[in-house]
Amino acid sequence: DLSLSPRGRELERRLRDFLQRRVWPNEAAHADETAGARAAGDPWQPSPLIAQLQAEARAEGLWNLFLPDSPRAPEGLSNLDYAPLCELMGRVYWSPEVFNCAAPDTGNMEVLARYGSQEQQARWLDPLLDGRIRSAFLMTEPDVASSDATNLQCAIRRDGDDYVIDGRKWYASGAGDP
């Protein structure tokens, strides 16, 4: 059965309503804001519009919908219930950020939630879930086709109580993108 759960249907309705009221009407304003930041020589500055919409989305319970089965994100959904929400959010390239559902943060938060120590979760996962920081996933390496995240040469090994990461990364841009 690929039907949405009652909760999934309700969140889809609420998300569609939020997008219609707050995101879709602001596409031109976001484009103007982005163009202004670029013209001012600061393309990576945080967007005041997105910050405002994030506060509204959080207040309406439309925050961290992607993370299933986590005590830190009880709003989380199954992949089946989350998929139609992604489709709706995907209509505007920047809207997943409004709901704290943007890559690479979503994948990095999932990894931290599943495998991170309590210390790592407190230091990195909690601020990511709160939307206070952003993360990066740098998979570019000089000797492999790095658009495939399973095709990495970088290696990690245990050395006593520590881990040693050994590898080279290629230039990456956008790491400063809030």
PLM segments and residue spans:
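Glycine-rich, Trp-frequent "lid" loop and neighboring beta-strands that shape
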Residues: E75, Y115-P178
